[in-house]
């Protein structure tokens, strides 16, 4: 199996056929022995170092070198820029070895065009099966029998009815087969605007639209080649529309590319799909696929582009109320009027509360002005209660001062003096009370003695 040419830049071009067409090339390869160019004394590191620095390719894996050797132009743009001019367009000897020398004249190679948009887990198997069937058609005997099992498996919808044609039909259908997938795939010039075609395209024989035999052969042979990126068969027992195959085989300007995630949704639809209908169905079934469009390009018909623009505008208009619902800066329509809280304030001013009244609970402020008014009202009530408490305390001190004999005439007595004199006066009153209690006891004892004397005098 020949490997990549490493004449110009040996350190940059891969030598592993399985990792050649990966979009993310590993920095180091285990099979490279001449990576270090320091000299004969330099020794490569061990296997653990290679495993540490190896960058694993991301899935899906690229096709093997055995199935893309006949490719006239590489699919990876970085590899294309690094390849030399001689190796960029393939080796004619290798193409002749496979019996596909005619592929060199086709600028849009169907294998690369179909392989440039891998999608799904079975893309590699479909590509290998398509290339193997091409090789069988190219090497087949003159008396070709019924269709091969691979072709039957790739065409369960009955598109392989052209496989029963004779050797002449197979030989005539081979160039059309190789040119047919290019019409169904995306042109690289649309995706990559830089000029990459180095050769002039060879003239491709076009089958007339009026011959049903040749059209059937083209339709049957083109089905396995387009299985890599085209949609799967619509219904198992329903044959495909022959007119659509004729239009696709004779028109090189129309392109069609359907992704694998749309295959399940488009099983009951025809091959030509209205974009507006697809948008309505996708928007109703999956609410997240708002900006996802079905890739159906018809340059001759400009009505589909207008329909796509109108559908996208409709979808964007549907999303507008959702953004408006989450606009927290907008004023809420459920805010009550600001006339109710001032009525409570007027009520509190008209009927003042008593001394130990409970302050009404604070209402939810709807504006800064209402919050300021409530704060001032609360401060005013607090001042009133504090003033009443101070007046009561002052009147109590004045009453206490009036009861102290030393401070009756002193109107400017301080509160501390009033408290001290009142304490001394209380202590003096308590001492006087104690003396009076002792005198009372003496008097009661004297009374008892006198009563006894009176009784003795009466008995005598």
Curated annotation (Swiss-Prot):
Family annotation (InterPro entries): bHLH_dom, HLH_DNA-bd_sf, Myc_transcription_factors, Tscrpt_reg_Myc, Tscrpt_reg_Myc_N
Top-rank lineage group of the source organism: Eukaryota
Localization per Swiss-Prot or TrEMBL: Nucleus
Entry GO MF terms: DNA binding; DNA-binding transcription factor activity; protein dimerization activity
Main location: nucleus
Sequence motif 9aaTAD, location on chain: 76-85
Region annotated Disordered, chain positions: 131-169, 221-288, 330-388
Positions of transmembrane segments: none
Region annotation (Interaction with AURKA) ranges: 19-47
Positions of the bHLH domain: 377-429
Protein name: N-myc proto-oncogene protein
Annotated source species: Marmota monax (Woodchuck)
């Amino acid at each position: 199996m020949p490997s990549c040419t490493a004449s110009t830049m040996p350190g940059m071009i891969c030598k592993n056929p399985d990792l050649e067409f990966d979009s993310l090339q590993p920095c180091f390869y285990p099979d490279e022995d001449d990576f270090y160019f320091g000299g004969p004394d330099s020794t490569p590191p061990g296997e653990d170092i290679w495993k540490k620095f190896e960058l694993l390719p991301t899935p899906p894996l690229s096709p093997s070198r055995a199935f893309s050797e006949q490719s006239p132009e590489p699919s990876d743009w970085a590899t294309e820029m690094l390849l030399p001019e001689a190796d960029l367009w393939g080796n004619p000897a290798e193409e002749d070895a496979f019996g596909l020398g005619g592929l060199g004249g086709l600028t849009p190679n169907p294998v690369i065009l179909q392989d440039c948009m891998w999608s799904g887990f079975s893309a590699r198997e479909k590509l290998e099966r398509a290339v193997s069937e091409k090789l069988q058609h190219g090497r087949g005997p003159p008396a070709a029998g019924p269709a091969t099992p691979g072709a039957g498996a790739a065409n369960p919808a009955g598109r392989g009815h052209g496989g029963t044609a004779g050797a002449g039909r197979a030989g005539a259908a081979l160039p059309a087969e190789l040119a047919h997938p290019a019409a169904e795939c995306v042109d690289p010039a649309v995706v990559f605007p830089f000029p990459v075609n180095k050769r002039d395209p060879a003239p491709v024989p076009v089958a007339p639209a009026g011959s049903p035999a040749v059209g059937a052969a083209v339709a049957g042979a083109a089905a396995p080649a387009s299985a890599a990126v085209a949609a799967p068969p619509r219904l198992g027992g329903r044959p495909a529309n022959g007119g659509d195959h004729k239009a696709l085989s004779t028109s090189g300007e129309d392109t069609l590319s359907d992704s694998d995630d749309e295959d399940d949704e488009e099983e009951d639809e025809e091959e030509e799909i209205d974009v507006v209908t697809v948008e309505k169905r996708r928007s109703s079934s999956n609410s997240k696929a708002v900006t996802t469009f079905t890739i159906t390009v018809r340059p001759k018909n400009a009505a589909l582009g207008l329909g796509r623009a109108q559908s996208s505008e409709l979808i964007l208009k549907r999303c507008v109320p959702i953004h408006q619902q989450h606009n927290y800066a907008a004023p809420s329509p459920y805010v009550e009027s600001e006339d109710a809280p001032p009525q409570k304030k007027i009520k509190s001013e008209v009927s003042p509360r008593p001394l130990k009244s409970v302050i009404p609970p604070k209402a939810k402020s709807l504006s800064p002005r209402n919050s300021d008014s409530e704060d001032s009202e609360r401060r005013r009530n607090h001042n009133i209660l504090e003033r009443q408490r101070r007046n009561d305390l002052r009147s109590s001190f004045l009453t206490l001062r009036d009861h102290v004999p030393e401070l009756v005439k002193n109107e400017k007595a301080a509160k501390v003096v009033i408290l001290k004199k009142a304490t001394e006066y209380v202590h003096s009153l308590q001492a006087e009370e104690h003396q009076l209690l002792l005198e009372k006891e003496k008097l009661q004892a004297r009374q008892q003695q006198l009563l006894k004397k009176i009784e003795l005098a009466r008995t005598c």
